[in-house]
Amino acid sequence: EIQRCDWSSDVCSSDLKPVHPWRRVRAKANQLLHRAYTQDKETAPRRYALDVRDAPVAAFLGAQRRLATEYCGEMAPMDLEEYRRLGGFEVLRACLGGDVEGRSFPSAESVIAEIRASGLRGRGGAGFPTAEKWQVTRNAPGPEKYVVCNGDEGDPGAFMDRMILESYPFRVIEGMIIAGLTVGAGQGIFYIRAEYPLAVARISGAVAICEREGYLGDSILGSGRPFHVRVVRGAGAFVCGEETALIASLEGRRGAPSFRPPYPAERGLHGRPTLVNNT
């Protein structure tokens, strides 16, 4: 009697071969006889026109305007001149008293009001209103404050932070500078996991370029307002994506979450008010 084999048994017999030689011979013979005499035929894969699957997606995405990923695939990541030609650092100038498309943001409150009107929320999962976090950090008393960019994404198959950091380093730096000016911070920190060497290299290179061009340093674009940035590589611990664990890691301690309150916006890095935003 021929032992019936199906697709799953074929896979098992190829990967989990019997230990005894005679059983191997018998299994192989059964497999060959099954293929020779079986009447079963494999079902061909079903094919659909592309518009059946892609049309609804295209209808949803086509009407959207890209913001964070604007000029995707068009702009060279490390080309500062191209970034400026496409409007880069214009909003930063507007926050320093300049004008962009007839608009200016002369005060920190006007920046926060604009963010509140936009409805911008955090992308870390909780969806906390960004304007509220900025407002709390700005109102927190203290001689020194920090801005931290959380680039430590640990979700399997998630590369949002990686894509943004690798593709738009100047855009992320500009956003950090604006955040620092708004909340009153003088130092920014990029916390990027070491598994993203290209992201680390591009952000580090972009920081050096911005320092040379006057966008970072003791006087941002000659405004007299200082802002310095450094890059820290994370060791890859999933828990360090949580903001209090991230701060503990920055302080050289074990990356473990702590109870809140106080929140980092009130008492964060080195006991100072700290704004932690996702990339």
What are these regions (language model features)?
Residues 8-279:
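Feature of Fe-S/electron-transfer and energy-metabolism proteins
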